[in-house]
């Protein structure tokens, strides 16, 4: 299950994972299936968008349906009938997103279950056990994600705690893993402070993770700040290891990050935006709720080969959205994910052909 960099165009990389015969080419975008499903789609529909690896959330699955239920099926893959690889998030981001429901201690985090109000204690060790029981192909260490604009002292304290939890995650993963083919990724923290990011990465490299993620981004910083940080930290990540930018993002974010050497992405944006009627097309975004689409008989995007664009008009999609029909969310999601996966396919081809700069230029020119 080794990662290989196959070709490179400046900093942009075309790579490959082999998960038991499932070949995953990078740069890759992973749709978010928090609860073991990409909202509104069945497995065949997910596959037909070109998606080959998905992300699920270990903490949310631990709360519902529960670790034991998934173990009855043998793995999360069996539970949801998905035969591709799965990456699971550890629950660290929920320290940020569910901050009103948790209290952080050095040993772990006391969460208040948002479903039934009961308290539970999540530790690095428990997070590893949950993810191992899920059968995750890529397991994320348990970390503390904080807001980007915290002061230096608070950011340093959180970064050091994440390093401590990373060591504990590494030890417990090595002790409990059932399969040598599971991968464990470390997460680089340090907020907006390059010196703290440097320390975080240096210590994580000593722990020899299978890949390295950049955490604590897409949480309020500007694009320029994110790009500046990527320019600084990405070249320091071991070249033979995959680089994962968590929670990012818009199509232009993916392109700018690939340009800076990132290999892996996940984000709720294409699926969440689809449910809100924001659809990505070659020349920008269509807000299908706009009344001007009521009598528009054209397809969403003439260049798109997705099921939605091959079968339905903008007028029909506008109608479904105005009636709040479930089918509307489904067709929109199919389109947005297909758009993202086609974008990644074209990015990979451009890197292979050493034409990534030309691809980037054409991408932005189409948006004008």
UniProtKB/Swiss-Prot annotation:
EC numbers for this chain: 2.4.2.29
UniProt GO cellular component terms: cytosol
A GO molecular-function descriptor: metal ion binding
Cofactor remark: Binds 1 zinc ion per subunit.
Binding positions (substrate): 89-93, 143, 216
Catalytic residues as annotated in Swiss-Prot or TrEMBL: 89, 266
Pathway: tRNA modification; tRNA-queuosine biosynthesis
One GO BP: tRNA wobble guanine modification
Region named RNA binding: 247-253, 271-275
UniProt enzyme class: transferase
Keywords tagged on the record: Glycosyltransferase, Metal-binding, Queuosine biosynthesis, Transferase, tRNA processing, Zinc
Needed co-factor(s): Zn(2+)
Positions bound to Zn(2+): 304, 306, 309, 335
Catalyses which reaction(s): 7-aminomethyl-7-carbaguanine + guanosine(34) in tRNA = 7-aminomethyl-7-carbaguanosine(34) in tRNA + guanine
Family to which this protein belongs: Belongs to the queuine tRNA-ribosyltransferase family.
Function comment: Catalyzes the base-exchange of a guanine (G) residue with the queuine precursor 7-aminomethyl-7-deazaguanine (PreQ1) at position 34 (anticodon wobble position) in tRNAs with GU(N) anticodons (tRNA-Asp, -Asn, -His and -Tyr). Catalysis occurs through a double-displacement mechanism. The nucleophile active site attacks the C1' of nucleotide 34 to detach the guanine base from the RNA, forming a covalent enzyme-RNA intermediate. The proton acceptor active site deprotonates the incoming PreQ1, allowing a nucleophilic attack on the C1' of the ribose to form the product.
Record-linked NCBIfam families: Q_tRNA_tgt (TIGR00430), tgt_general (TIGR00449)
Subunit-structure text: Homodimer. Within each dimer, one monomer is responsible for RNA recognition and catalysis, while the other monomer binds to the replacement base PreQ1.
Protein's UniProt name: Queuine tRNA-ribosyltransferase
The species this protein was found in: Buchnera aphidicola subsp. Schizaphis graminum (strain Sg)
Taxonomic lineage: Bacteria, Pseudomonadati, Pseudomonadota, Gammaproteobacteria, Enterobacterales
């Amino acid at each position: 299950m080794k990662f290989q960099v196959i070709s490179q165009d400046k900093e942009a990389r075309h790579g490959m994972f082999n998960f038991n015969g499932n070949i995953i080419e990078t740069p890759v975008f992973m749709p978010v299936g928090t609860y073991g499903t990409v909202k509104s789609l069945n497995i065949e529909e997910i596959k037909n968008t070109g998606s080959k690896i998905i992300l699920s959330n270990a903490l949310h699955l631990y709360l519902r349906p529960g670790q034991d239920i998934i173990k009855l099926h043998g793995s999360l893959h069996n539970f949801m009938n998905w035969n591709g690889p799965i990456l699971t998030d550890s629950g660290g981001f929920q320290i940020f997103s569910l901050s009103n429901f948790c209290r952080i201690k050095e040993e772990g985090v006391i969460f208040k279950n948002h479903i039934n109000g009961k308290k539970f204690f999540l530790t690095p060790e428990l997070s590893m056990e949950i993810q191992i029981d899920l059968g995750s192909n890529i397991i994320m260490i348990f970390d503390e994600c904080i807001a980007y604009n915290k002061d230096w002292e608070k950011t340093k304290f959180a970064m050091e705690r994440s390093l401590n939890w990373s060591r504990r995650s590494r030890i417990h993963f090595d002790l409990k893993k059932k399969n040598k083919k599971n991968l464990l990724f470390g997460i680089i923290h340090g907020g907006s402070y390059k010196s703290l990011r440097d320390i975080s990465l240096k210590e994580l490299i000593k722990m020899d993770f299978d890949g390295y993620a950049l955490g604590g981004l897409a949480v309020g910083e500007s694009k320029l700040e994110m790009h500046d940080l990527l320019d600084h930290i990405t070249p320091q990540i071991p070249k033979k290891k995959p680089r994962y930018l968590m929670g990012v993002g818009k199509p232009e974010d993916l392109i700018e990050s690939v340009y800076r050497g990132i290999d892996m992405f996940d984000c709720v944006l294409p699926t969440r935006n689809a449910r809100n009627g924001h659809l990505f097309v070659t020349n920008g975004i269509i807000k299908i709720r706009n009344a001007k689409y009521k009598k528009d008989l054209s397809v969403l995007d003439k260049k798109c080969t997705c099921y939605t664009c091959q079968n339905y008009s903008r007028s029909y999609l506008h109608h479904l959205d105005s009636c709040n029909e479930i089918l509307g969310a489904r067709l929109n999601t199919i389109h947005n994910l297909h758009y993202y996966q086609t974008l990644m396919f074209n990015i990979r081809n451009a890197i292979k052909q050493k034409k990534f700069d030309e691809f980037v230029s054409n991408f932005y020119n189409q948006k004008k």
